[in-house]
Structures are given as structure tokens and as C-alpha cells.
Curated annotation (Swiss-Prot):
Organism lineage string: Bacteria, Bacillati, Bacillota, Bacilli, Bacillales
EC number: 3.5.99.6
GO BP, one annotated term: glucosamine catabolic process
Keyword Transcription assigned: no
Gene (name only): nagB
Keywords, ordered alphabetically: Carbohydrate metabolism, Hydrolase
Protein name: Glucosamine-6-phosphate deaminase
Function: Catalyzes the reversible isomerization-deamination of glucosamine 6-phosphate (GlcN6P) to form fructose 6-phosphate (Fru6P) and ammonium ion.
Biochemical pathway: Amino-sugar metabolism; N-acetylneuraminate degradation; D-fructose 6-phosphate from N-acetylneuraminate: step 5/5
InterPro entries membership: Glc/Gal-6P_isomerase, Glucosamine6P_isomerase, Glucosamine6P_isomerase_CS, NagB/RpiA_transferase-like
A GO term from the CC aspect: cytoplasm
Length: 221
């Protein structure tokens, strides 16, 4: 698997806007970044998603995750996440999308779920979707239950950038690690372009980098 840090260094040559992701896949990357001299003090970040119902200092909120894994060592000029405690979630989703549209994402980090979700865009999400409120699939809640005391504590809803929101980024870095991601990555690379595999939207983006530890072949047909 190629090292993503050179890509970040090339981008990090001035005011840059990053879309950031969370989860176990990103932890080694953020740990490496924290040991470098990369400076984000002139940069802006937008997080891909956030749970509904968790305050920012909750240990499983993505605001807390970002502080623990990156922001405490590498602060940005400004860092934006959806407000998990917003009194009107639909208005909060619209507010966050409007904020995104005021900026242009230079670089978007993504992981991929076993069902092909990117962010919390579950199978069946429209490729035209903007930032929205989503009810999480049971498979996604099960996958994230390891971070909570029990699955009953895993939120049932989340905010997520929509697929169209993600696709506006100038460059996308998708990281897929481990055998559990093989099947879905092979389907994406086989150009199985369908809303039932949200990540397949990336095949239509002009500048996507895929980093993986898997030996997979791209279907050239």
C-alpha cells in the first residue's frame, strides 16, 4: 500500500480545505501525520459525518475522535463538524451543506464500509444527495458497536455529507484495508455503478486515489 503522506504534503502548500473521515481505518494515518512537520494552521477541515444525539465531548462522537487523533497535535485554522445535539436535525443538515458550498474541498479522505457505504451514505442513497440526516443500517450499527458498551448505545441516526457533496472534492483518497473490504472493493473496481453500492459513484470522479493492502484487479472492460 502506498504512503498517503506525500499526497498530503503536496496539497499542504497554502490554504487548503480538507474533508476528513473517522474510524479505525484512519487512525494509523492520523498517528503518522501527528509525527510529521505538516502544518495545518492555514487549512480548514470539514468532517464527513457525525452521530445524532451525542455531544461533542462524548467519547464516541466524531468531534471527540478528531480531537483525540488529530486536532490536539495538528490544529486547523477552522474545523467544522455537524452539531450532533442540534434541536432541528434537518435544519442542521441544510446549514452544514450551505457551509460546505461556501468552500471548495481540495482533498477528501474516505473509508468504505462492507456494504459499500461512504460516510453514512447507505445502499440506496441517491448519487445526487447533499448533506442529510440518515437512519443507520443495522449492519453499520453492528460494525460500529465495538466502539460502544453495547449495540443499544450506538446511535440510530447520523448526519453525513451526501454523495454529491463528496464528489465535489477536487481529489478523493479512498482507503480500504483488510479482507472484509475485498468483495465490495472488487465490485467498485469492476465498475458496478449502482446506488446499491454508494462507493461506486467514485468511478465517475476524475481524480480518485485508492490505497489498499488487498490484491484486487480492476475490470478494464
Amino acid at each position: 500500500m502506498h504512503e498517503p503522506l506525500p499526497s498530503l504534503r503536496l496539497l499542504n502548500n497554502g490554504s487548503t480545505t480538507f474533508g476528513l473521515a473517522t474510524g479505525g481505518t484512519m487512525e494509523p494515518l492520523y498517528a503518522k501525520i501527528c509525527k510529521t512537520d505538516i502544518d495545518f494552521s492555514n487549512c480548514i477541515s470539514f468532517n464527513l459525518d457525525e452521530y445524532v444525539g451525542l455531544e461533542a465531548n462524548h467519547e464516541q462522537s466524531y468531534a471527540y475522535y478528531m480531537h483525540q487523533h488529530l486536532f490536539h497535535e495538528k490544529p486547523f485554522q477552522a474545523s467544522y463538524l455537524p452539531n450532533g445535539l442540534a434541536t432541528n436535525p434537518l435544519e442542521e443538515a441544510a446549514r452544514y451543506e450551505a457551509l460546505l458550498q461556501q468552500h471548495s474541498l481540495d482533498f477528501q479522505l474516505l473509508g468504505i464500509g462492507q456494504n459499500g457505504h461512504i460516510g453514512f451514505n447507505e445502499p440506496g442513497t441517491s448519487f445526487e444527495s447533499l448533506t442529510h440526516l440518515v437512519t443507520l443500517e443495522e449492519s453499520t450499527r453492528q460494525a460500529n458497536a465495538r466502539f460502544f458498551s453495547s449495540i443499544n448505545e450506538v446511535p440510530t441516526q447520523a448526519f453525513t455529507m451526501g454523495i454529491q457533496s463528496i464528489m465535489r472534492a477536487k481529489c478523493i483518497l479512498l482507503i480500504a484495508v483488510g479482507e472484509t473490504k475485498r468483495e465490495v472493493l472488487e465490485r467498485v473496481l469492476a465498475s458496478d455503478y449502482t446506488e446499491e453500492i454508494p462507493a461506486s459513484a467514485l468511478t465517475k470522479h476524475p481524480n480518485v486515489i485508492i490505497l489498499t493492502d488487498l490484491q484486487v484487479e480492476e475490470n478494464k472492460s
